[in-house]
Amino acid sequence: MISRAASRFAFTIATFVTVLVTFGLAPAAAADLKVISAGAVRGLISQIIDDYSRQTGQKFDFTIGTTGQLRNIIASGQHADLIIVSAPLMGELEKTGKLTPGSRAELGRVGIGVTIRDGAPAPDVSTPDALKKALIEARSVAYTNPAEGGTSGIYFASVAERFGIGDEIKKKAVLTRGGREAAIEVAEGRAELAIVFISEAVAVKGVKLAGPLPPALQDYSAYAAAIPSSSTDPTAARAFITALTSAAMAERWRSNGFEPPTR
C-alpha cells in the first residue's frame, strides 16, 4: 500500500514536471546526467530519483563521496553535469572558475548526530558531559575515517580530542569511507554508536538517532548545487536543481534532517 505521504510526493513531482513542460524547461532526457554528490544528501536523493526519472525520462549517473574524496575526484578532471557538495568545497570551485556563473543554489544545512541500533537503549547525549560519558561507555564507535576527508569524521575526532579521550576513541573506532557506511556498521551490529550527519542516520534502516550533538558542540555543514562550466547538459542539470529547491521539497528536506539554508 502506498502511504499518503508517498502519494502526495508523487503528485508534487508530477505537478512540478507539468510546470517544467509548460514553460519549456523539461530536460530532453537523452544521455545520463552525470552528478558528483556529497554523501550527506544521498538519502534524500534516493527517495525522489525514481519518481523524477519516471516523470521526466531523465536518467542519472551518480558519483558519491566525502568532501575530501570529491575534491580529489573533481581535481582529477572527472566530468560532471551537476555537482552537489559542501559549501566550502563549492566556494573553492567558484574561486577557480569551474562553475557556471549564477548556477549555484543553496540546499540546506545539516548537523551531526549520535546513531544507535533500533531497539537499543538510547544514551543521553544532550550535554557535553553526557556525550563524553556515552562515548567512554560505548564498546565501539563508528565514524568516517578523517583520512578520507569526511567532514563529520574530522569534526568528531576533534571533539574527542577536546574531551581528552582521543586515544581511547581511536582504540575502539570503526572507521568507514562514509557516514552511511558508519550507520550500517551499527545496523549490522559491528559498532555500538555511529557519529554521522543526521541525514545519513535517518536514511539507513535498522538504526535510529539517539540525538544530535549538544548545541555547544554542534557543527552544521551547508550544501549547495551548481552546474560546472564544463557541463554538457546544463538544461537538465538546471531542471533538477529547480526540483530540489522547489517549495514542494521543503518538507522532504526537513524530514531528512536538513534545516533551510541560511544564505
Stretches with model-predicted labels:
Residues 1-8:
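N-terminal secretory signal peptides that target proteins for export/translocation
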Residues 10-24:
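Bacterial N-terminal signal peptides
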Residues 27-76, 87-97, 101-110, 116-263:
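Exported/periplasmic ABC-transporter solute-binding proteins
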Residues 81-84:
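Periplasmic-binding protein-like
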